[in-house]
Amino acid sequence: MRLTGSVVISLEVELGWAKHDLNEYDHLSEDRRTETRTLSDLLDWCESAEVPITFDIVGHLLLDACDGNHEGRPGDEWFEADPGTDVESNPLFYAPDMIDAICSSPVPHDVCTHTFSHTPCGEVTSETVDWELQRAQDAHDEFGIPWSRAFVPPRHSSAPVGVLKRNGIDTVRAPEPCRLIQMNTGQRLYHNALSPYQPSDGRVCDGTAVTPSTPYISLGCPNLPMGQLDPHPVFRPIPVSLRKRWHLRRLCRGVDRAIRSDATLHVWSHLWDLSNVHQRDIVEQFIAYVGARQEQGEIDVLTMADFGRAIRQTN
C-alpha cells in the first residue's frame, strides 16, 4: 500500500546558529529584521491557503535569555558564539517571538527539532547527539509545546537510531542519494538550479520514518539572491524575471508529478534563503498553488510528523 500524492514543506530556522562554528553571519539581515518579516509573510500565505509547514527549529532559539553556559555537552568551545544575553540584545540567537508566531497560527504547523545548537551529528559522538536532542526537547517543555516527533539533522548528517528513539524521534528528513560529489562545478550548478524535482516514496528504517529530500535547497531558488547573498556569477546575466518563472514552474511541476505518481514531494529551504523580495515572490505563488491543488482534493499537504504516521500505517 502506498501513500496518495503528497507534499511536505520543511523550513530550517537557524538564524545566527546556522554557521556560528564558521563565524559566518553575512547571509543574515541586521537584527534579523528581514527574516522576521519573511516568517510573518509566510505564515499569512499559509493561513490563506491552509498549508501546514514543518519548521525545523534550533532549540536555543526557543530561549528568551541565557547566561551562555550550557553544562553537560561533551566537547569544548562549541558555545563560544553564544552571547549569553537575551532576545532584545541578540535576536539572532534567541527567537521566542518567532516560535510564538508559528504556534499562534490557526494552521497546524509542526515545530520539529534541528538540535539545540545546530550540531552536525556525524561530526560528534552519539553522547553529544543525545545531549543535543535532550536539551532541545527540554526547551520544548520549557516553552510549553509538545516534544518534537520529527528531526532534521543539521547539514544532512545522520544520527544513531537508538539516540533518536530515546529522545522521542520517529521521523527524519534525509537527502536522496545523489551524484553531486562526482560532479564538476558546472554540472553541480545545473543540477542544483535546473534539474526537475522528482517526488519519491518514503521508507521506514528500524521503526523510523524517512522522508527523502534533495541535498540542496529546493523551496528557495539557488540561482537568485539567497538571503543577503548574491547568486553565483554564472546566473547574473539571466533576467531575474526569467529565473523566477523557471523556478516556480519547476516547483509546480514537481507537485504535478507527485499527484500523477502517488508519491511525495519534499521541498525545503532555510528561512534566511527566502529572506528577500525575489524569493518571497516565488514562495507566495507556490504556497497558493499547493493550497489550490489540496482544496481540489488532488494532493495532501503533510507535516513531517503527519508523513511519519502515514507511512508507518502503510508498511
Q: Regions from the language model: what does each represent?
A:
Residues 2-101, 107, 147, 282, ...:
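Active-site beta->alpha N-cap acidic-glycine motif
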Residues 7-11, 53-55, 109-114, 149-151, ...:
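Hydrophobic faces of well-ordered beta-strands that scaffold small-molecule active sites
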Residues 23-34, 80-92, 117-127, 147-149, ...:
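The substrate-binding groove and active-site-proximal loops of carbohydrate-active enzymes
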Residues 50, 171-176, 241, 245-315:
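C-terminal domain-boundary segment and adjacent tail
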Residues 57-64, 149-157, 302-308:
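Short, solvent-exposed turn/loop segments enriched in Gly/Ser/Thr/Pro and often Arg
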Residues 83-88, 142, 146-261:
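Active-site-adjacent pocket scaffolds in enzyme catalytic domains
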Residues 129-140:
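An active-site-proximal "capping" alpha-helix that borders the catalytic cofactor pocket
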